[in-house]
Amino acid sequence: MIEYMEYVLRQFERTTSWDRDYSYENITATSDNLLQFEIPDSLNLQISNQSTPNTFNTFELSNRSIINGSLSYLYTDCGQLDKIVQNSLKVPLQQRVDTYQCLRPGRTLGTSFRSQMLLYGRMYWPGSILEAMYCKRLTPQSQLVLKSLLSAAGESSILTLYWQRNAPWGSQDIVFSTNELLLGYRFLHNLSPGRSHEGSPHGQSTLSLGAEFWLGISNLLPGCSTALRYCTHATNTGKPITLTLSLNPLFGHISSSYSVKFSPGTTFCSKYDFNVYSIESNLSFGCEFWKSSAAAHKQATNEEETSIEVATETPVSDPRYCGAVPGARSFDQIRPFAELPSDNQLYHQLMMPNSSNALIDNVNLPFPSPLLRYPPEKSVTDKFAAMIDATQFTSVLKMSSSLRDKNLRLLWEGKYKGFLVSAGAELTTIPLEAPKTINEITAQQVPRPLWLRPAKFGIQIQYST
């Protein structure tokens, strides 16, 4: 479940027309959300409040190892943020759950721009650790982000600086961190057809190519990776499909994933990992099932039927729908001359309207009239996306498994009487007394039980006003 402060941050990006989906950091977010979702490992309680239109705060309490907690505070000068940030009772569940990313090509930036900022701070106790973030929009396509992690115990503090650029063609990130003087550069380029092809099947696809390069100045250790993402929709059903391919040449790791949304409430994902140096591989599967209330489903069905009835209703007030050509003579006027041969010139003159050009001007009039009875037809992609947005989901069940780890991850997230509840567990065949990291030789020596046993379990409860 997305925490309240993270939810406010994403709404801030949405208000300021900043698209986080088109960044290299989130290029594999769809498969990560379906396979590597976070499972609570303790009892966690979060209470959040919007004290003023520009300030938000959260109090967190958990029993992870010992009783600990945190206090968060967020301030922003964005005037419209209080209108779109909703409490836990009214917020749609899709906005608080990391799920499938439905990317749409041809995005545009906002017409108006105003430099806005966001301040965030979080104090952890009893460790006395301070986490802070400062975000400042510089231009309509760039922003500056400063993150820091400070400790009162005298340990070294970490300061990270981001310069980010977000444009319709892609994104760029320049990162510098005081931790080992790390310097990095990330970019993502979108190869989409553009807005001129939105009506065609090719206009619903997006191909993104990106890479990242890192260098530790203090130890001169390099790092790099590249990734490819292809997002498209089925031409007959409009179901979104996402394929990714990533490569880390230094470590020899290759990863590919395939994700598809079969219906508004069903998603499936598979991922294959392979290492060219160690010849090790792994196959992972994940799925999620969304549940909607019966009343919401019935309301959406009734609205769809009503819209169809209104669209197919024929406006009788328009004379074009009567099928007659204006200016043409009536049948009673030409009845006496009906027996004339068709090759007689008088026959054609009587059949013509009063104006010789009237029939030519209106020859196409009866043909488009049936089409005018219906509104412009939406594509199957737009219909599928509208169906997802109109559905009011109440809960979601996530499951993932890995052949190499031989585990089963379960997570249930939903709304219950104004509370956002997230409960999950990880079941594995590794004994509890075994170390968390074991190689293949040690894994063969450690006996594995026949049945899965819980390795992690937790519940998270969030409430916001």
Swiss-Prot record:
Chain's role: Component of the ERMES/MDM complex, which serves as a molecular tether to connect the endoplasmic reticulum and mitochondria. Components of this complex are involved in the control of mitochondrial shape and protein biogenesis and may function in phospholipid exchange. MDM10 is involved in the late assembly steps of the general translocase of the mitochondrial outer membrane (TOM complex). Functions in the TOM40-specific route of the assembly of outer membrane beta-barrel proteins, including the association of TOM40 with the receptor TOM22 and small TOM proteins.
Name of the protein this chain belongs to: Mitochondrial distribution and morphology protein 10
Gene Ontology biological-process annotations: establishment of mitochondrion localization; mitochondrial genome maintenance; mitochondrial outer membrane translocase complex assembly; mitochondrion-endoplasmic reticulum membrane tethering; peroxisome organization; phospholipid transport; protein insertion into mitochondrial outer membrane
Subunit structure: Component of the ER-mitochondria encounter structure (ERMES) or MDM complex, composed of MMM1, MDM10, MDM12 and MDM34. Associates with the mitochondrial outer membrane sorting assembly machinery SAM(core) complex.
InterPro entries for the chain: Mdm10
Family, per entry: Belongs to the MDM10 family.
Keyword flag NAD: no
Gene that encodes the chain: MDM10
One Pfam family it belongs to: MDM10
Signal peptide: none
A GO cellular-component term linked to this record: SAM complex
Annotated membrane topology: Multi-pass membrane protein
Keyword match Nucleotide-binding: no
Entry comment, domain topic: Lacks alpha-helical transmembrane segments, suggesting that it resides in the membrane via beta-sheet conformations similar to those predicted for other outer membrane proteins and porin.
Key words, A-Z: Membrane, Mitochondrion, Mitochondrion outer membrane, Transmembrane, Transmembrane beta strand
Subcellular location per the Swiss-Prot or TrEMBL entry: Mitochondrion outer membrane
